[in-house]
């Protein structure tokens, strides 16, 4: 349940499990809008598909890349809600909680992508990696901003 007390973000475990993937879906749909506008914007999901299949990023299965994108987005929403809940116990569930959760989530998303799948992907030369990392950082920022807004709206933090 969402607590009315002091405008805190407080979710029960069950509510958090239900809300997290929904938050992630909304944030992923917003991310899609950003991805479509960037030169390497649609490359990050293909990076994940490349790692899983061993194929080049440019020939990785599009359907698999899309599936990975949305499943990872839903899972990241669950992670964001969990981080916000944990930080809420320490910071009191205020706007500071969502700010701190956003910083942690963005760091995890960008760091994980830059150090785990991107270096393992096939067909991404060093020069292109920098452009893909930059695109991912912009997309992840959009994701986190929307996730924070949705959690704030649901948790009545705003």
Predicted regions and their residues:
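Juxtamembrane/disordered regions of integral membrane proteins
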Residues: 1-158
